[in-house]
Each structure stands twice: as structure tokens, then as C-alpha cells.
């Protein structure tokens, strides 16, 4: 049936058995990809340093999703939070991957069975003997079952009543772990950063889905509505399904890019807005201030800053710094972080503390400018040395490190001072290993960036798909030239416009 590539799906348009078959095969492909991708990631994942080389630095995509749902252990004897374990149980990373692959195989066999045995009694209308589907009834069944799954996830899995709970962390991504969640039924449940809202919203939405499903199973649509929305046409189902999918894709693109309780920074990396707002920098300075108030020395106060917190405050972990067409993990860009060198404090010869102005997200290069506590420029690395007034040499800038590997070390030679001033533009300074992976030094995005870009792009495409198929089903008679209420037998090919005797073709 020489169909063009963009019309091949019409072969299942009036064939319920094979329509079911291709959907089962699609599920097999999705599940098989998920399981295979998980096994591939587990083969290349290095769990040895969860602080400086976490999953998101290594470009892991499916491991974070398993982890946020409560999977933390591997049959390889390691745990995502570091350390070793002896009894990971069946629901380890490998167990979940294997379950997806087994499920994929079963779906594959089911798809073949339904393709071969397509002409089943269940698909036949007993009044006409022709294949047909009761689409409003099927909608009710699907709504009921998805509501049941939604309710079960919120009431049992997330709450820990029968399940592990989900990944929960503090606002700075330092203390994350899998734990059970109490539903948040107050106004706080609408805060996207409150995990309790995940439980309560799934319970509420699931309950609504169950009730709506039962409603659609027990109440038939009015005839006018049935005809108006073309409820008997399978393309109506396609159009509304695409709408549900693109809406969900837009929502998750937003929750991923802007951050939420469902996308913890320990699993997906920080958001770009945390760099833009100096989010981690402010917390670090607050902690240092608390240490100084407790009569600790500057060195002791900085030494108490967790390496994990300092690492978040580094521009290389900003997902917006990676170019769209730079493939590979963050580790393939600026390298594998080995250790925090410490916090550099710059001073001029008059003893004033100077702060390096940080590079904004969308700059590749940025002038090195050092300002005092009042924001007045006191030193820089000039573009034209002949006209410079504030060069490091002229101002006599020195640098001393507090905390980290260089704790207590100071430099006064201008070359070294300028080197660390340039690196301080990028946030906290880390030693990076670029040799192991042959990293090229060009920043990459985190899985947060890839997920957002992918889902926003497909959401846009699916939006147009919804408009396209919605228009086709609503205006089918206009496009086809056939009145859907036409009862008379029409001879295809006899008229230029089907069923219109005024356009009878002339014999040649």
C-alpha cells in the first residue's frame, strides 16, 4: 500500500488489535532503553567520590531518577552516599535495570502476539460485526488505573508506608538521603521546594483520577458533545494524548531548570540561578561569619566550610555554562575535581581586603577587577599596560589562602597573584584533573541542562502535533471532502469530490 513515510500510521487507524500491538511495542522500546541505559551508566559510573565527582558531574542521566525514587545501593557493593554495603537487596540499581529489561522482553512478545492475533472478538462491535473501540469507556478505564497508580505512589511509596520514600535534602544540597515523607496538606504543600507537596498532590490527584475514571465508566457522554468533540474518532484520542504529554513536558522542563523538591541538586547539579544570585557564596560567608563570632580564627572558620558546599560555588557546575552542542559530561570539560585549594583573600599594600568580581553566567571572558568592601575598584589586570593605574604590580596586591589544601599559604609575586585572581572569577578554586579523561577545558552542561533542553524542545514539537491532529479530527469532513453523515453508497473515483454528482469525472 505505497504510503509516504509520514502516513504509515494510517495502517492501524481502523485496526484496534494492531493499534494495541504497536503501543505495547513502543512500551517495550522505552522500557528496554531505560534498562539498557541504566546498565551502561552503571558500567562507566565511578562512585568513589560522591562529594567532588558526583553523578551529575559524570553526566549520569537515569541514575539520578532512580536515586530520587529511593534506590541507593548497587550489587557492586557500593552506596550512592559513599562507603560499602553488604546486602543491597533486589531493588538495587542493577535490579531496577534488570526489571526494565525483563518487562521490555515481555512487552515485545505481547506486541508480536497482538500483531498476529489482531482480529479478536473483544474489538468487534456486536451490533455491526465490524472492529470498533468504545473510546469514552477506554478513557474511563485508563483514567481510573492511572489515578490508582498516582494515589498508590503518593500514599505508599513517597510516605514510606510501603516503599522507601524519596530523596530529600537541605536547601544547600549537603545532607541528602532517602527518607519517608509526610503529606503537606496546608498552604506549604504548594511550595515547589517542599517535599511534602509531592505526597499530598499525588494522593489528591490520584483520588480525583479514580473518581473521574469511575464517572466516565458509568456515565455516557451526551450525543452533542460526542459528535462535537469527535469522540468516536481515534485521532481525537491521539490529539488529546499529545496535549497531556506536551503539557507535562513543559512543566518538568520548568521544575528541572528552576529547581524544585523533585530535582535535588545533589542528583542533578545546581541551577544557574544559584550562581547568578550568589546563593552558595552567601551561605559560605554566613558560616564564616558565625565562626568568627565564636572567636575562631579566619583560617579555622574557613576550614569548617564543607568541601561539598564550596564545590557548588564554582561556575563550572553551572548548567548554563555548557554550550548546546558540546557533548559529554562536565568531567570531560573542565576535568575531574580533585580538591579545594581554599578561599583566596586578596589585599592591597594598605591592607584593604579586595574581592574579585565574579564572571556572569553568559560570559566566556571577563575583565579581572578587584573591588573593596564599598565596591570601589582598587585593582585590576589591565588590557593596556601603558595606561594602567590599578595593575596588581602598581597596587601591590597579595593573596592568602584560608581553608583547603593551601591553608595559610600566601603569595606576593604579581604573576601568581594574577593567576589566582583569574581563577577566583570562577568562584571557589579547585584543583582539576584534566589528564585522566583528556578533558578539553571547555565547560559542559549538567544533566539538568540536557533534560530541560530535550523536554522543552519536544514539548514545542508536540504542541504543534496537538494542533495538527486536533485540527484534522475536528475538520475531517472539510479536509476529506466527505460529509461524515453521508449514508448513501459512494463510488470512489467517479467524482472529483467524493459523493458530489455535480463534479462527475469525464471519460477520456
From Swiss-Prot:
Cofactor note: Binds multiple chlorophylls. PSII binds additional chlorophylls, carotenoids and specific lipids.
InterPro entries per UniProt: PS_antenna-like, PS_II_antenna-like_sf, PSII_PsbB
GO molecular function, one term: electron transporter, transferring electrons within the cyclic electron transport pathway of photosynthesis activity
Membrane topology of the entry: Multi-pass membrane protein
GO cellular component term of the entry, any: photosystem II
Regions that span the bilayer: 21-36, 101-115, 140-156, 203-218, 237-252, 457-472
Record GO biological process: photosynthetic electron transport in photosystem II
Localisation: Plastid, Chloroplast thylakoid membrane
Key words of the record: Chlorophyll, Chloroplast, Chromophore, Membrane, Photosynthesis, Photosystem II, Plastid, Thylakoid, Transmembrane, Transmembrane helix
Any Pfam family the entry gives: PSII
Stored NCBIfam families: PS_II_CP47
Family according to the record: Belongs to the PsbB/PsbC family. PsbB subfamily.
Subunit structure: PSII is composed of 1 copy each of membrane proteins PsbA, PsbB, PsbC, PsbD, PsbE, PsbF, PsbH, PsbI, PsbJ, PsbK, PsbL, PsbM, PsbT, PsbX, PsbY, PsbZ, Psb30/Ycf12, at least 3 peripheral proteins of the oxygen-evolving complex and a large number of cofactors. It forms dimeric complexes.
Record's function text: One of the components of the core complex of photosystem II (PSII). It binds chlorophyll and helps catalyze the primary light-induced photochemical processes of PSII. PSII is a light-driven water:plastoquinone oxidoreductase, using light energy to abstract electrons from H(2)O, generating O(2) and a proton gradient subsequently used for ATP formation.
HAMAP family in the record: PSII_PsbB_CP47 (MF_01495)
Protein name: Photosystem II CP47 reaction center protein
